[in-house]
Amino acid sequence: MIILEILLWIVIVLVAFRILIGIVRKLIHFPAPAFISIFLDSKARGWWQPPKDIIRFSNIKKGMKILEIGSGSGFFTIPAAKVLGYDGEIAALDIQQEMLDKITKKLEKEENSGIENIRCVKASAYEIPYPAETFDVVFTVSVLQEIPKPHDVLLEAHRVLKKGGTMSISEFIPDPDWPLPSTVEKQLTAAGFKNLKKHGNFFRYTITGVK
């Protein structure tokens, strides 16, 4: 009985914390700090947001040129790079140099030796430094809603995507900025994306749209 009470209180505290953080994030927009990468790179995240699922749902395939908006420390970047192979390329875009430095450090590890198709790009998602119709896929994971003007970001993503290219947005409910799937669908539609598809479930999903 005592154990159940403790577990209940833990759940209550976690829910309250998530609500509090969510309120703060609505009032003050800020990117996830670099130190949080210890959680973003955890094995637990590999269970609830498996990179292989994100890659599959996002239609990422060998030889493509793709862009990740808000790459963070590269939790999805490196697995995607391995799928792309030597003929493909991924641009890892993040506004924080500290996060991009973490990707560079990971690439020095033996298990990532030979990966040479990642380009780290420090830039704002409002002004993606690439010409129109550059990428086959643009994807973002638990990032879009923490940006003050997500519509502007999606318009930029639409610009740099090739015709017929895929825009992919993945979300998971523990994230304080988690949106309803219907919210993401409306955002994609408003930015000009069509043929929307939802993968996963209500709590953990990927929604894709086509340019």
Predicted regions and their residues:
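A short SAM/SAH-binding and catalytic strip from SAM-dependent methyltransferases
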Residues: 136-149
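Class I SAM-dependent transferase core
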Residues: 4-64
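Conserved beta-strand signature within the Rossmann-like core of class I S-adenosyl-L-methionine
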Residues: 164-171
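Class I SAM-dependent methyltransferase SAM/SAH-binding core
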Residues: 67-69, 73-127
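Conserved Class I S-adenosyl-L-methionine
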Residues: 179-199
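Core SAM-dependent methyltransferase catalytic element
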Residues: 191-192, 200-211
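A short glycine-rich, Lys/Arg-flanked "PGG" loop and its adjoining helix->strand segment in the class I
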Residues: 151-163
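A short acidic, Gly/Pro-enriched loop at the edge of an enzyme's catalytic core
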Residues: 126-137
